[in-house]
Regions:
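Basic, Lys/Arg- and aromatic-enriched nucleic-acid-binding interface segment
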Residues: 99-128
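Short functional hotspots where side chains directly engage DNA or cofactors
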Residues: 144-148, 217, 226-244
Length: 244
């Protein structure tokens, strides 16, 4: 079976030396795990091992192995055409880690509360619970900042001119989101957010997904992980390490 790697690479025209070495390494590692007799079971074992690698490496290895499996099938070395798939968790991470165009969030909506919730999350990285606890006196219009008080800790976040314009009309209230002077429940917030995201065609997103979009935008702007952690109210950067 191992000699099949050399034969496979010989048929790969136009590959650079580095690319051939990469193919060879991935395929030898593949055979080390599945053994000389390829089966559905051995492939599942290999596929489970893929989750230990970064997503980019997983995609490369799956592509190389699928090409090799097809080559073996064509040559009659294996009687079944097997095909590996990217681990589900990797697919999920891939989707969640994609920087999305959310410019439509600034457009009018039939769900204005859900819209503002979404903007506060994606622009400032706030949690729904933090947003619902916000009082209008936490907003300083003159200095364009927002004060977050949580668990005896305070953090100050800068407000963009656009976001400030969204908050100004609410300054006569006690809370940013309230009914008869009392804050809305978390369930209400999630319903409003869900309805807004569905309206804008992002029904697969959630508050957590929007918070990740904030992180991705910060990284795109070359903001240091420690500074991002500070903005999010995190004590360490541990949960942000995957974005390095």
């Amino acid at each position: 079976m191992r000699e099949g790697i050399s034969a496979f690479l010989e048929e790969k025209q136009g590959l650079s030396v580095n690319s051939k070495q990469s193919y060879k390494y991935d395929l030898e590692q593949f055979l080390d795990l599945v053994g000389e007799r390829i089966s559905e079971t051995s492939l599942k074992i290999y596929q489970a091992q893929l989750s230990n690698f970064k997503i980019s490496a997983q995609k490369r290895k799956v592509s190389a192995c699928n090409q090799f499996l097809y080559f073996l099938y064509q040559k009659g070395e294996i009687g079944t055409f097997y095909r590996l798939e990217l681990p589900k968790q990797a697919e999920k991470k891939q989707v969640q880690s994609e920087l999305l165009d959310l410019s439509s969030f600034w457009q009018e909506s039939a769900y204005p509360e859900g819209r503002l919730l979404a903007l506060l999350i994606v622009e400032l990285g706030l949690l729904p619970s933090e947003i619902l606890a916000l009082k209008t006196n936490d907003v300083n219009l003159d200095f364009q900042v927002l004060r977050i008080n949580k668990a005896s800790q305070q953090r100050i976040l800068s407000l963009s001119t656009n976001l400030l314009g969204e908050l100004e009309p609410l300054m006569g209230q006690t809370y940013l989101f309230e009914k008869a002077g009392k804050p809305y429940s978390r369930q209400w917030a999630f319903r409003q957010l869900e309805a807004f995201l569905k309206e804008k065609g992002f029904s697969d997103l959630s508050a957590q997904g929007l918070r990740e979009q904030f992180i991705l935008r910060q990284i795109e702007e070359k903001v240091d992980l420690y500074e991002i952690a500070k903005k999010l109210g995190l004590k360490t950067v541990m949960t942000l390490e995957k974005y390095r």
